[in-house]
Amino acid sequence: MKSLKELSLRIKNIRSVQKTTKIMQMVSAAKLLQSQKKLSNSKLYISKLHSIISSLMLSVDQELLAKILNVSNNGSYLVFIVASDRGLCGNFNSSIVKFSQNKLITNGKKVDIVFLGKKAFDIGKNRFDSKSILKIENSKGITLKHVEALVGGIDLSKYDKVKVFYSKFYNTFTQKPMLETIKPWSKDSSLIDNSLAGPITDYGYEYEPQNIEFILKSLVQDYVVIALYSALLESATSENSARMVAMESANRNTKEILNKLALLYNRSRQAAITTDLIEVIGGAESL
């Protein structure tokens, strides 16, 4: 049996850990609310944008549509893997990397990978057979302007497809790894909310300049930026939720450990007192 001093020190250390996990849980809860608000605004915007593009494309023939969507066959993919810079969020980072590894079918294509998040890079840098791998840290601090600069600095025309792996937020306890293709543009997207998008109709828009090709090209380019930014917000919200749940679980575990240690401490203390009493009584009888 451990000594009272050892038990007391262990209880003190675990209480210190419990304070840390409680603070992290509260911070994650506050960040979760903030990221949910940003995600809600982003989802409304991208859903409306997707609906407008879908409606405008109804008036475009297939030849012009292929030109607008910049469909190419250059033999290469660009892949973004969105995760976190930090740990202590359960299997959040490892699950998205594992999902990406399982779902990324290259068909012999050259693949350039961009990891948005240090942890994803650390876990996945040796798992992908890719000659070009880039890491971007502080993924949660990336703003819309940063994404615009990032996408603007990439020649998307040299890629057949641009894919994004991210963690989609459903609720506090449910986040699922997802794969979204943001180039070429698709009428189906996991990033949009159909209840927010509105109906897709061909009743006709009035637009200036009266050049449907120019307008659609601009909107599709904007959509790539917004889609990547939305994936980052989905991932940040999922991360905050996963960390909050992980810290809540850690708090429960520390409570259980503290209860067991308190019981063990009391028993050890009681045994020590009993031993002392026996020694005192034995000493008195010898007199």
Swiss-Prot record:
It comes from the Bacteria. Produces ATP from ADP in the presence of a proton gradient across the membrane. The gamma chain is believed to be important in regulating ATPase activity and the flow of protons through the CF(0) complex. It is a peripheral membrane protein. Keywords: ATP synthesis, Cell membrane, CF(1), Hydrogen ion transport, Ion transport, Membrane, Transport. CDD domains: F1-ATPase_gamma. GO terms for molecular function: ATP binding; proton-transporting ATP synthase activity, rotational mechanism. This is ATP synthase gamma chain. GO terms for biological process: proton motive force-driven plasma membrane ATP synthesis. F-type ATPases have 2 components, CF(1) - the catalytic core - and CF(0) - the membrane proton channel. CF(1) has five subunits: alpha(3), beta(3), gamma(1), delta(1), epsilon(1). CF(0) has three main subunits: a, b and c. It is found in: Cell membrane. The keyword Ion transport applies. HAMAP family: ATP_synth_gamma_bact. Its main location: membrane. GO terms for cellular component: plasma membrane; proton-transporting ATP synthase complex. Belongs to the ATPase gamma chain family. The gene is atpG. SUPFAM superfamilies: ATP synthase (F1-ATPase), gamma subunit. NCBIfam families: ATPsyn_F1gamma (TIGR01146).
